[in-house]
Amino acid sequence: MSLLTIAQSILKETKSGSVPTSIIGNTEDVAKQILEVMTVSITELARSFNWQELQKENSFSTVIAQTGYNLPTDFDRFVNNTFFNTTTQHAVMPVTPEEWRVLNNQGITGGTGFSYSRIRAGQVILLPTPAAVEAHIYEYISNLVVLSSSLVGQSTWLADTDVPAIDAHIVRLDATWRWLKNQGRPYGEDQKIANNAAIERVRANGERRTIKHYYYDANIKIGYPQTITP
């Protein structure tokens, strides 16, 4: 479904009277209002979940004595626990600005086996200062939440033929309750349906781990029995 067909479907379902034949560039109030709703919807959905459709990888090699490395132009946020130094096979641990200052003041240098990172001014900053050329990789969520008709990523709607990068049905459900709210109409039940559908889609649309009875994770404070006796 495209921007135009989603918008028209919402307007027809909610019996909103006028159903425009175009959205982008249309000066009618209904077209401008539904475009605003669609923009808010795709933005909020993209920020609320780590959609697999928006997940990407970025890799780079350090430069000796250089601490900062530019983030991808479409970077929105890190996928947690995916930043690794693939040369040393060690994780790069994210820290808060306060923790960063403490570590920096301690004068940490290479050789400890530990490395830290933070995001600042469009760059990922590493500590300690790299003393060698080493490969790094991390996963991130892209801000290109819309695709053109030729499947080129965009950060917003630019044409009636654009399609959402994430599940179009979820976008339609989410935009429906937002449209009803915009019009001052009851929307609670539609919002509940949309939220539940989004959560279920995220669960179903990505890989999930099978829980095994012998699995152990020190961070999880429960035990798994090795055998089960009926």
Where are these regions (language model features)?
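Glycine-enriched, solvent-exposed interface loops adjoining structured elements
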Residues: M1-P230
